[in-house]
Amino acid sequence: MEGGDQSEEEPRERSQAGGMGTLWSQESTPEERLPVEGSRPWAVARRVLTAILILGLLLCFSVLLFYNFQNCGPRPCETSVCLDLRDHYLASGNTSVAPCTDFFSFACGRAKETNNSFQELATKNKNRLRRILEVQNSWHPGSGEEKAFQFYNSCMDTLAIEAAGTGPLRQVIEELGGWRISGKWTSLNFNRTLRLLMSQYGHFPFFRAYLGPHPASPHTPVIQIDQPEFDVPLKQDQEQKIYAQIFREYLTYLNQLGTLLGGDPSKVQEHSSLSISITSRLFQFLRPLEQRRAQGKLFQMVTIDQLKEMAPAIDWLSCLQATFTPMSLSPSQSLVVHDVEYLKNMSQLVEEMLLKQRDFLQSHMILGLVVTLSPALDSQFQEARRKLSQKLRELTEQPPMPARPRWMKCVEETGTFFEPTLAALFVREAFGPSTRSAAMKLFTAIRDALITRLRNLPWMNEETQNMAQDKVAQLQVEMGASEWALKPELARQEYNDIQLGSSFLQSVLSCVRSLRARIVQSFLQPHPQHRWKVSPWDVNAYYSVSDHVVVFPAGLLQPPFFHPGYPRAVNFGAAGSIMAHELLHIFYQLLLPGGCLACDNHALQEAHLCLKRHYAAFPLPSRTSFNDSLTFLENAADVGGLAIALQAYSKRLLRHHGETVLPSLDLSPQQIFFRSYAQVMCRKPSPQDSHDTHSPPHLRVHGPLSSTPAFARYFRCARGALLNPSSRCQLW
């Protein structure tokens, strides 16, 4: 589009040049116009020189015009990264579809049956980590790098894992006192076994205990006690008939585990059945989160002594002290409990079992541990788990999980235990200083556009606008990876306690203990930094309310979403819209009922209703639905994020010439901007969309585009077309 504007101005410029030549040639004194005989040779020479000078000026002016045209107009980007992106767009889009009626299919029509764009990028990032881990290097002995590579290789050594068989797991069971299933059981103290399971193996059979922020003081850590994480779907989410089938399948799975560990089939059946009975009774004690929140019982502060009175079967002090070493706990230590009634009922059940069926209680705990550790065991355990997952997904009408290669599992586990080490290696290769600098410049442009936009929102008064602008100005941004993750000297210290054993299971258990100790230690720092909720190679950005920081991991700022060599239209349309979306989450509280008392609530409510009606009017593919009460905040961030990114891009074009385009697409820079935005949303609709806080992919494309007048202008959409409605909403 810029090139076209430039060519329209060219004739006017040349007309002015011609005029200059005419004026120049007429400049002469009255004396020179007299017919003096002796001056004729000089006059001829002067005319020749004048003509040469005029021709030279015209030539220079033409060269200048050509140079400006070449540098201001959109030139095709012929680099390898641009050609790869061009091919990606051509492969995923269906340009036979009219963009003004179905831009999602225009951009994603051939990509509907593939994974979504974010999943594809996540897989690429894991492949990069795989290549890093499989390159032979000479690392400093005992370093985090050496241990990470050794752990990955141990995970990939399936021959050694198969050869070890159940031996390493049997040793663990013996250390815990054994169980009746194998015929060897020592009647140990129940709380001693529970303490070992929690502190040494990261297994919590009856409740969950973890460190989290204090409800009233987000930067103060506090131990939190919650319902356990069950290995089967919760009963309230399933119909009664399906619920019974689910437990039958789970019983079959537990029988397989007991048999694989050498148990007598009749004993295995008996103990597995009672384990299922215990789980079923624990299910009955659960109360939904919404109910607890409505009753004001989701965050209850109690001391360890008080908890001991409520649930006396558990030795809370010794179990928690062992789990959260090096914290120093006392009976007066305050805890946050998320379901007191569950803990009371759970304690009564444990006391009943200890009186009558202590050995079955031991088997229940051991079976749960075997389930937890099964990913580190041989192929027989893996196959049993795969069959259970397949059956459960069929019963709950979920699509089958695609088979995952072994390397991906090993990359993920290595990343869990050695995140700082892998973060440094990943960032060094995929997010160097020049890439980070370009990403920060993009973020600055997006942030400035948001601040400008806040000044013109009709539903904000001046005081609220100033408050909002200050909040954006004070925001911290962490780009690529946290500083903590990129300090190799810290990584070396953190891994000193990891002892990689002779079996893969032993190595996993050592890493589990080390990771738990590191998490506790990080919470105990006097001035803790923001703890990232994602790994640097992940593809999810987020905003932390408690720390007022926005995080963009290096894994997100990769092709096809971002690259310093891409046309600016691509970076602003894809990564820029994501950045703007996350920034708008700073103000989600203002959009909630009563969240902005100083705002023009009538205008705000009208904008709410307008946006909801706007999204409800769009047609959806069959078997696709969404809940507008769940998706409203994300819809608002999608619409506003696109508008802010476009505003930032338009300002960038005014200040910086020389934009490029992707060759062979026949799209202007502005059209590429919108295409890049839509490309981010490419994925197949899912039945789970009805429970998602994000709208289905069609709506995430069509909702924001139809709310943006510039889209209809650049794609020349007829008035009244689906993506050029007669009226629009403005919230942000």
Swiss-Prot record:
Residues 68-732 are extracellular. N-glycosylated. Glycans are attached at N94, N115, N191, N345, N627. Changing E494V: In KEL10/Ul(a) antigen. Gene3D superfamilies: Collagenase (Catalytic Domain) (3.40.390.10), Neutral endopeptidase , domain2 (1.10.1380.10). GO terms for biological process: establishment of localization in cell; intracellular calcium ion homeostasis; intracellular magnesium ion homeostasis; myelination; negative regulation of potassium ion transmembrane transport; potassium ion transmembrane transport; protein processing; regulation of axon diameter. This is Kell blood group glycoprotein. Its EC number is 3.4.24.-. The lineage of its organism: Eukaryota, Metazoa, Chordata, Craniata, Vertebrata. Residues 76-732 form the Peptidase M13 domain. The chain crosses the membrane at residues 48-67. It comes from Homo sapiens (Human). The modification Phosphoserine is found at S7. GO terms for molecular function: metal ion binding; metalloendopeptidase activity. It is a single-pass type II membrane protein. Its cofactor is Zn(2+). Changing L597P: In KEL6/Js(a) antigen. It comes from the Eukaryota. Keywords: Blood group antigen, Cell membrane, Disulfide bond, Glycoprotein, Hydrolase, Membrane, Metal-binding, Metalloprotease, Phosphoprotein, Protease, Signal-anchor, Transmembrane, Transmembrane helix, Zinc. Binds 1 zinc ion per subunit.
